[in-house]
């Protein structure tokens, strides 16, 4: 028997765990592509639904294909009554990621994927319903309102989410920001949640189980939630100078500052500059100059003191805040977007599958002598 290849490095950093045609991350120290398309081009020019089609169907849609795709998604927004009933039982103090995990799992019970031929239809249903799941729970548990999730007045997923959350039609600026944000978060190669989805898929499990496992993985603070932590940090400061003093204290105390650095990117996160542009535009549109100034100062101090760059999460915090999105819902938006990447990886794993079963290096005790229970201790 040949020896298994030893994989060094904590968390398998720097190790290849498989092949993918979906995404490249940090190939030049800064780059990000989806199926060969640069993230900057997609973020500047594409609607999120075009990106979803690219990842899930395999190509950028024609206008006719995009219209059909969006029409299909709009028609899938109505929450099943039994799912509504379940969401109404979840208390307001529940973690929103638990709501997403539970909602996905219940959907898998109500509308199971019977064969892999149904994977595209099952994914489209989740893509249409995930904004409805989080907003229905939030509005009912916090406001006592039962929203009509079958609303068809917004043709984009981002616009629909904002309409369900606030009850008001979003501005065109807000719609554009959501297209960009959802595009930036859509896919990122073998991150922890995506790899969890692929491991689950490799057992030939159903797609709802794969996505539920991915949501549970993203719930962990070392993977998801960085934009929420960044928001909690920056909103405590009322000026750029106060922010600089605060960051210097945190650095002196060796506290972790969320939203900076990345496991793969060496020079910069290309998503940061893209969402930062929108954060600035939003700050001007809503007349909130101080939070953006605080964010910029924190970015400058971290670069000066630690030579660390912002990742995608940092300026997302202020961008979401400017649009009136509660901080606790930041990570569920990530789920609404990353579903496209998770599902595309599930499809890819299924198409060329072998169960993922790595080896481990045993570090426990060697041979032990059995003792009857009365002789132990």
Language model segments and positions:
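Non-transmembrane, aqueous-exposed alpha-helical and coiled segments at domain scale
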Residues: 1-377
């Amino acid at each position: 028997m040949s020896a298994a290849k030893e994989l060094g490095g904590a968390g398998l950093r720097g190790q290849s765990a498989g092949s993918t045609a979906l995404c490249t991350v940090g190939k030049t120290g800064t780059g990000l592509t989806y199926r060969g398309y640069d993230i900057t081009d997609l973020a500047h020019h594409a609607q999120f639904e075009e990106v979803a089609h690219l990842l899930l169907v395999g190509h950028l849609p024609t206008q006719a294909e995009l219209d059909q795709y969006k029409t299909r998604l709009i028609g899938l927004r109505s929450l099943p009554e039994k799912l509504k009933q379940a969401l109404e039982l979840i208390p307001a103090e529940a973690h929103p990621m638990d709501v997403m995990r539970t909602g996905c799992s219940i959907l898998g019970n109500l509308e199971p994927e019977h064969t892999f031929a149904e994977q595209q239809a099952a994914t489209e249903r989740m893509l249409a319903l995930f904004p409805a799941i989080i907003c229905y729970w939030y509005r009912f548990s916090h406001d006592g309102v039962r929203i009509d999730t079958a609303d068809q007045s917004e043709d984009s997923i981002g616009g629909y989410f904002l309409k369900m959350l606030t009850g008001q039609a979003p501005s065109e600026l807000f719609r554009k920001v959501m297209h960009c944000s959802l595009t930036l978060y859509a896919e990122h190669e073998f991150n922890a949640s995506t790899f969890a989805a692929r491991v689950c898929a490799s057992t030939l499990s159903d797609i709802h189980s794969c996505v539920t496992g991915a949501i549970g993985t993203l719930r962990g603070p070392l993977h998801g939630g960085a934009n929420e932590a960044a928001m909690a940090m920056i909103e405590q400061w009322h000026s750029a100078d106060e922010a600089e003093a605060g960051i210097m204290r945190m650095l002196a105390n060796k506290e972790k500052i969320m939203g900076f650095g990345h496991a793969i990117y060496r020079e910069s996160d290309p998503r940061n500059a893209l969402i930062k542009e929108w954060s600035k535009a939003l700050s001007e549109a809503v007349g909130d100059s101080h939070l953006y100034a605080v964010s910029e100062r924190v970015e400058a101090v971290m670069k000066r003191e630690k030579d660390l760059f912002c990742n995608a999460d940092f300026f997302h915090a202020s961008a979401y805040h400017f649009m009136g999105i509660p901080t606790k819902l930041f990570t569920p938006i990530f789920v609404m977007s990353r579903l496209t990447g998770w599902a595309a990886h599930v499809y890819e794993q299924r198409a060329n599958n072998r169960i993922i079963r790595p080896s481990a290096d045993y570090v426990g005790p060697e041979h032990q002598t059995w003792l009857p229970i009365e002789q132990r201790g």
